[in-house]
């Protein structure tokens, strides 16, 4: 394993990526989580934006989340794949008022699973629930069925409502807290999932440098 990645994992650095179509509110969700305030008129992400935050899981474990907010525009999709590398958690975001963005969720999940074999937890985020339900283009039953059929969880959220954003990241944080390096393994690059799986050992020794940083 790349020594940089190994060091990050040993220091409880967990890579979380946000994927989804353009305009669904990925950057606004990240901004709400980091700064606890809403933001409007966000410029489209180009490539990816990076931020990190130290958090505490329900089990008391302190984690460092490395959050990658990726571009959703179709012209950047080939670039976005680079940021899948070594992700352990994924938030797949869509806009409840945009049917096409929900239809695209299958593409994003399938693309992730084809190109990344380290992702432990996928959470589908139905965003913009602050908008009147008369304007929703996706029903909860559809979301529930889709996630059941595609083996992932879902949550409703609004980047304007901090409690919903904290809730979705709380779910991710608790899942990430189940992951740890096996100290007894002869291979230092093996990570096992407590009471869940035999482990993740297919890491790619490369991290893309084409990103911007959120301070």
UniProtKB/Swiss-Prot annotation:
Gene3D superfamilies: P-loop containing nucleotide triphosphate hydrolases. The keyword Hydrolase does not apply. The modification Cysteine methyl ester is found at residue 212. A motif (Effector region) lies at residues 42-50. One of its GO terms (molecular function) is GTPase activity. GO terms for cellular component: host cell plasma membrane; membrane. One of its GO terms (biological process) is protein transport. It is a lipid-anchor. It is found in: Host cell membrane. It comes from the Viruses. A lipid is attached at residues 211-212 (S-geranylgeranyl cysteine). Keywords: GTP-binding, Host cell membrane, Host membrane, Lipoprotein, Membrane, Methylation, Nucleotide-binding, Prenylation, Protein transport, Transport. Belongs to the small GTPase superfamily. Rab family. This is Probable Rab-related GTPase. It comes from Acanthamoeba polyphaga mimivirus (APMV).
